[in-house]
């Protein structure tokens, strides 16, 4: 049986460990220390590292993990990932028979130019592109690129479990409620998220069904989001890219 465990790192990162009580994949290891401790405690044998993008809080632990376990490193072909042995582009497939797992690689640029996601068997590891009720900042791409990447992820089945890399959910929900105040799914989600955090339980994974109902960055064609974005910029916005760009910029400065 497959389990996905969140190893916490830094202030709010999750390093995901996909395992079957014997073998393990390590996803976006920004810090080796907590990973080494948990892997040792569980007596697991790592078989690969999977990276979504080059930012240090997703890759900083790779050299130590490779030194310890001598395992392959998968990552985006056009980004500098330390120790990368298997450069990937969208459309590639990965097979890990030890875990009976297969992943498809999706190109999802925007947060970084080469950002990729890993999708298979209802698991989506999407790094810093799609967050629970939010999305990543646009550092290397355009609003149009980022929206297209989010729409690509939103086209996956509703039951897909979303494993993003940061615990940003409550802040994202509070921003979403400003944009979409009468959305009953958001009101319910806020309560659920607050309760989980009170108990120190991760709010992830989310699901694409929940994201499509609550995430304003996936709902740029909805009247409530269009209205809020238009009011914020002081003019009517009539296309999803303009709405997306307006609310992404708003979120950058939202307190």
Swiss-Prot record:
In terms of superkingdom, the source organism counts as Bacteria
Cofactor binding, per record: Binds 2 Zn(2+) ions per subunit.
Catalysis: reaction(s)? an S-(2-hydroxyacyl)glutathione + H2O = a 2-hydroxy carboxylate + glutathione + H(+)
Q: Name one Pfam family in it.
A: HAGH_C
Q: Which cofactors does this protein require? A: Zn(2+)
Gene Ontology biological-process entries: methylglyoxal catabolic process to D-lactate via S-lactoyl-glutathione
Q: What does this protein do?
A: Thiolesterase that catalyzes the hydrolysis of S-D-lactoyl-glutathione to form glutathione and D-lactic acid.
UniProt pathway: Secondary metabolite metabolism; methylglyoxal degradation; (R)-lactate from methylglyoxal: step 2/2
Question: Is tRNA-binding there in the keyword field?
Answer: no
SMART domains associated with the record: Lactamase_B
Keyword tags: Hydrolase, Metal-binding, Zinc
Going by the record, the broad EC class of this enzyme is hydrolase
Q: Which family does it belong to?
A: Belongs to the metallo-beta-lactamase superfamily. Glyoxalase II family.
Output the Gene3D superfamilies linked to this UniProt entry. Ribonuclease Z/Hydroxyacylglutathione hydrolase-like (3.60.15.10)
Binding sites annotated in the UniProt record for Zn(2+) 2: 57-58, 128, 166
Per UniProt, Zn(2+) 1 binds at 53, 55, 111, 128
User: Is the Nucleotide-binding keyword given for this protein?
Assistant: no
Q: Which residues cross the membrane?
A: none
| Molecular functions per Gene Ontology | hydroxyacylglutathione hydrolase activity; metal ion binding
Name of the protein in question: Hydroxyacylglutathione hydrolase
Q: Which PANTHER family match?
A: HYDROXYACYLGLUTATHIONE HYDROLASE, HYDROXYACYLGLUTATHIONE HYDROLASE GLOB
């Amino acid at each position: 049986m497959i389990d996905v465990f969140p190893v916490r790192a830094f202030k709010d990162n999750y390093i995901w460990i996909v395992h079957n009580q014997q073998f393990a994949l390590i996803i976006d290891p920004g810090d080796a220390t907590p990973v080494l401790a948990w892997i040792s405690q569980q007596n697991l044998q790592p078989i690969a590292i999977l990276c979504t993008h080059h930012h240090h809080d997703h890759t900083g632990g790779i050299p130590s993990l490779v030194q310890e376990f001598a395992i392959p490193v998968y990552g985006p072909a056009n980004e500098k990932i330390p120790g990368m042995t298997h450069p990937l582009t969208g459309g590639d497939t990965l097979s890990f028979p030890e875990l009976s797992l297969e992943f498809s690689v999706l190109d999802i640029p925007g947060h970084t130019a080469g950002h990729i996601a890993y999708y298979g068997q209802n698991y989506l590891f999407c790094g810093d592109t799609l967050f629970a009720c939010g999305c990543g900042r646009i550092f290397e791409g355009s609003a149009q690129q980022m929206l297209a990447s989010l729409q690509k992820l939103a086209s996956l089945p509703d039951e897909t479990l979303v494993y993003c890399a940061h615990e940003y959910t409550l802040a994202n929900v509070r921003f979403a409620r400003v944009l979409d105040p009468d959305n009953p799914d958001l009101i319910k989600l806020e309560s659920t998220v607050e309760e989980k955090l009170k108990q120190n339980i991760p709010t992830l994974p989310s699901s694409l069904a929940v994201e499509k109902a609550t995430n304003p960055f996936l709902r740029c064609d909805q009247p409530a989001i269009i209205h809020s974005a238009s009011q914020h910029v002081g003019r009517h916005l009539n296309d999803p890219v303009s709405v997306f760009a307006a609310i992404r910029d708003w979120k950058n400065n939202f307190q």
